[in-house]
């Protein structure tokens, strides 16, 4: 099955995508070598792009099996949720941020908190200036959820790397990753979302036909749109570290 544009893939294609994932990943004992071979030969199936980037960026451990991938991505998703809670949750500061003239400890805290809030709002403003101009010729990037995804990833990364902070062009790097990842992620109903233990159980099924029956569930685990922000964040983080 061929696609004229990666952004044209719809949820109806998921059976084809999960089948490709099964034949090239789940039923293959040399996953990394298989992906590298596709890359060298220039015939990488489009539906394997997110998987290949996760290997190249080190999100998936190199020369490992798919159970190692499950463990790795699960740990990263837990880690990213903690980052979101730390940097994106509404903070309730102690001390009066407006009363900064006093010498007592409470007012000093208020001054620090006021400065932090100002700096964070300024960082968001600067990032948003680029986001509203990012690939606006592509409908995907005019969606509010994509703009929010871009903002969250860039804001959290800059908070964790304040020695670098935000630089113009970072938005374009994340946008390219979105183009590579987003078309192959889908919104699944709660009953379609397996947990880590179920996925490992299905992967360990020895009988090929029986294993194939559950391949779509394994595919779902790696391509849940609710988790794409996490996957993109660590891909971007790896890209930045390789470039820095």
Sequence positions of predicted segments:
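N-terminal transition regions in large eukaryotic proteins
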Residues: 1-163, 174, 178-226, 233, ...
């Amino acid at each position: 099955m061929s696609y004229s544009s990666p952004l044209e893939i719809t949820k109806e294609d998921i059976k084809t995508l999960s089948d490709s994932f099964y034949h090239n990943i789940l039923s293959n004992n040399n996953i990394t070598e298989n992906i590298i071979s596709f890359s060298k030969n220039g015939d990488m199936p489009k539906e394997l792009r997110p998987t290949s980037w996760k290997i190249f960026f080190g999100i998936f451990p190199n020369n490992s099996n798919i159970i190692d991938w499950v463990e790795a991505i699960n740990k990263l998703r837990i880690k990213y949720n903690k980052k979101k809670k730390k940097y994106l949750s509404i903070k309730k500061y102690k001390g009066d941020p407006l009363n900064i003239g006093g010498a007592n400890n409470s007012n000093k805290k208020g001054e620090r908190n006021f400065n932090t809030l100002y700096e964070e709002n300024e960082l968001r403003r600067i990032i948003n200036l680029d986001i509203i101009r990012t690939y606006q010729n592509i409908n995907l990037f005019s969606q509010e959820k994509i703009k929010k995804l871009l903002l969250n990833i860039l804001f959290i990364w800059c908070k964790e790397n304040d020695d670098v902070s935000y630089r113009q062009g970072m938005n374009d790097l994340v946008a390219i990753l979105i183009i590579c990842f987003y078309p192959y992620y889908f919104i699944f109903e709660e009953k379609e979302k397996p947990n880590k233990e179920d996925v490992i159980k299905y992967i360990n099924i020895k009988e090929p036909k029986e294993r194939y029956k559950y391949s779509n569930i394994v595919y779902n685990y790696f391509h849940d749109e609710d988790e794409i922000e996490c996957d993109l964040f660590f891909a971007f983080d790896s890209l930045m570290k390789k470039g820095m």
